[in-house]
């Protein structure tokens, strides 16, 4: 990333944002390993390795914070030195479960299980140890604690909503002893998560939650699902368009005890090998960021997360040499379009998405266009003569001639 972009982003992070404006903390980034820190800008570090087995995996009462400490150290810090990280719990250690039928062995020799602990005191002791460790002295305070990863996914949880409420109820008063900490609901995936989150909140989970978390994957990948996946706004998404996910979980929160409390996308993207063409990846990630930013104010979406940085299969925006892909570079550029402004919800006019960022700034793209093998289609698009220049997602700036731009699937920022 350029030194100018990095300096600008750091300045905004420290300065904060006025009410209603998109803060830099809105842009969350997952990280695969701490030895490969993101070379893109981000304001919140989201979704490190699930923490219970990582910290207390070997034996009851034996804690090793080394792995999670590395993520906390990597996270941006606010003016109070609080680590802006979503620390996620999940997978019960094997020693805490007598029935091992839901358990599996990890490469490091520990055992993880999807069942709840037999004795909730083990959970209480673990949460207490974590909060005591991240106390601002031995280690930085942590901003967000997510109770469990994907409680609606049997790969992570095979207990009931009521059992998850019990874990949240036990953890909440301990975590809230830290005045800087916020408790995030267990995350859910679409579509099973709609009902599961509703049951969790109606069962009392709303009493022990400061924010509602969901994972924003518009389309499924793997298991024979078609690729490339549709664009994140597409009605052909095999899960749901990202806008539908946001408004749905906003409604679930508001009608089940969390009226006006923030919601967060703690993980999301095109998924495992969902998009392979570099130009379409750049278009996809920028649509994803812009659409969510447009709904931030009206839905109290506090932050959203791209999963993930790292040379891995899911949402890959890093090259084999450790640099940002064209999608990663485009992500950086679009952050400069959005941070510090108050975007309105994007609207669709024919094939054209129109996203008003601020007075004199508008983002547009044409959903009917595409890219393949280094070539992208465009169509002439007439703009108001008030707009005199544009910027593309590579950062290239140019004057608008005769009130017309060549518009494709990649967004353009129009500027008066």
Per-range role (PLM):
Residues 40-209, 213-234:
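Substrate-binding cleft and catalytic face of glycoside hydrolase catalytic domains
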Residues 397-416:
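C-terminal beta-strand-rich structural cap/linker in extracellular carbohydrate-active enzymes
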Residues 141-145, 168-197, 244, 250, ...:
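Aromatic-lined carbohydrate-recognition surfaces of secreted/lumenal glycan-active proteins
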Residues 6-15:
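Bacterial N-terminal signal peptides
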Residues 347-385, 410:
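Carbohydrate-binding surface patches
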Residues 75, 130, 145, 171, ...:
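Conserved, mostly hydrophobic/aromatic
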Residues 21-51:
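Boundary/entry segment of secreted carbohydrate-active catalytic domains
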Residues 265-338, 345-351:
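Aromatic/acidic polysaccharide-binding cleft in carbohydrate-active enzymes
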